[in-house]
Structure formats: structure tokens, C-alpha cells
Amino acid sequence: MEIKIVKTQNKKVKPEASTLGFGKYFSDHMAMITWSSEKGWHKARIVPFENLSIHPASTVLHYGAEIFEGLKAYRRKDGGVQMFRPMENVKRLNRSAERLCLPTIPEDVAFELLTKFVEVEQEWTPSNEGTSLYLRPFMFGNDETLGVHSVHNAEFVIIASPVGSYYKEGINPVKIMIENEDVRAVRGGTGYAKCGGNYAASTRAGKRAEDKGYSQVLWLDGVERKYIEEVGAMNVMFKINGKVVTPMLSGSILPGITRMSCIEVLKSKGIEVEERLLSIDELLDAMKSGTLEEAFGCGTAAVISPIGELMYDGVKYPVNNGQIGETTQMLYDTLTGIQWGKVEDTFGWVYKI
């Protein structure tokens, strides 16, 4: 595939690592490729970062025809740059596209554009511990007409942002409020797709939690309001009686790549993992009896986020005395070690630029 590359004439000043935060700064370029029902995917290019210009009737603005992904590039200790399981993001992007009637993109096309973009922008990958270059591929319907329909025009774009920790607490345990009013998704809906509407619908509950001093919410299922699903924008895992329990993928839960990686690491260490329904009653019993040993969220942005406190119906339940658990720390060390090239990648997960 031919990718036209136009380099910027006005390079930005790179921010200090201590100021990064998450998603505040953007690199010099962006990658794009256009799709139409007549031409298919065409016009692949890497161009200077700039605002997008779209028609006021563009499908994405009115009907939410949008999906996205999130992955990272890491600076290894030898100075090189690598990505973590990028092909899994490409595969998930296409599953999301199918759900929202957006065009799927050939895996080799998406992968080539992504890797070439990271090659061009690799100097934006920070080297300080805990930092990375966050990559945000996204696709949106761009028909210049009103009316609900499958799209005839779309854009696929990749932007990059040097980042530090997702949560201000970093790897320190966070406080989570169990949500029993709003729901994130329902089976048969778009819960398994990575689309903007899922996140927009979650912000009200997140704001309520934030106002009460909590970092995020723990979601219950949308039908019975009984079974645990996700925590904030992450998958969630609990260590109960020596076993790691995580909600099974049921159509309303995003199939996280970090989740999948955690399960593989845990099994390689001989730790039993159960993917199954986990009710709030079972979790409450485990908290009250002391058999809940650890709890943590897992996702690309934060990698592993230990949970130090859960609050339900006004009652606060400490988890592991508010400390990072042994299994939680092991997963964080293993995954970040592989990502930054400090630990041997025996799984074959990294792609070197």
C-alpha cells in the first residue's frame, strides 16, 4: 500500500515528562485513510496534525457512527520503540465496525498504516518510567446527509499523545463506588464494541462518584442489576480465596486486550482463573468474610489499577487494607516489564518498530 507522507514544517516543543498527565498533548502528525462505498479504502496518508473539517450534517455528529481503539508505544531501555499486541487492537476495531455498520478495514492495511505512523512519530515516545506514547485510532461515518442508515463514506484516523499515568493515583490503590442506578450496557447492545456512545452514557455515574471522592464506578449488569461487569472504562478482576475471578464476556463487556493478557500471565504462573458470573451479593459476602484478597481494574490506559476501597449503598469496604496485593503487583510488573522491554517477552506480544 502506498502511504503519502507529508512532514510538518513546524515541529512542536515536546512537553516535560512531569507535566504529561493523560491525553493533553499531541504529536506532530496524524495518519488517515478514506473509505467510500464506491472506491473502498484509499488515499492513505500521514500529514501534519491539524483540525478535521467535516460537514455539519456528518453522520458522526448526529447518529454516533464512531468507534475507536487505544494502544501504546513504549521506549525500551535500549532506546528502541515497540508496541504491545497491536494486531489485537486491529481485530477489535473491526468487530466494533461490524456492530456499528461502519466499514471494516483489511488488517494488513490498518497495521501498515499504524506501524508507519509510529515509525514517523517515534521521537515522541517518552523514556521516563511510567510514560508511553498513547495511540488513538478511530473511525467515523462521514456522509453529508441526515437520516439513519449504514454509511457510504468514512474516515479512519490515528493520532498520538505522550502520556504519564491515567489516574492521578498512579499505581496506588483507588477508591471505587458500586453503581446501582445507571448501567453501562446491556446484552444485545454495543457493550462489546469500543464506541463513543458507551463512554458518553457512563459519564453521569462517573461524575457522581467523583463528586463523592471516588475515582470511578463499578458497573452492574443492565438487566438484573446483580452481576458485576466492568470498573469505569476497564475490565475488573477479584482475587477470592486464592482464585482470580473476572466477569465472563457476555456481549455487554468489552473484550479487553489487557484483560486477555492478564489471564494468560496468571495461568502461566499457575494461578487459577475463573471467567464467570459474579454477583454483587457474592462480592459483598467475600468482602465481609475477608475472603476478598485483592481487586483491580485492567486496561490499556492504566494497565493495572489496584482497588483499595469499594463503597456500596453508603457502606465502605476496604480491600486488602487499602494496599496493593501481591498478585496485582505481579501483573503490573510483568505487563509493564514486557511493554518497556525490561522483562523477556515469552508470549510473543511485542512488535518492535
Residue locations for each model-derived region?
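Helix-start/capping segments and mature chain N-termini
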Residues: 1-117, 145-353
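Short, glycine/charge-rich beta-strand/loop segments that flank catalytic centers
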Residues: 106-116, 126-143
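Short, charge-rich binding segments
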Residues: 123-128, 148-150
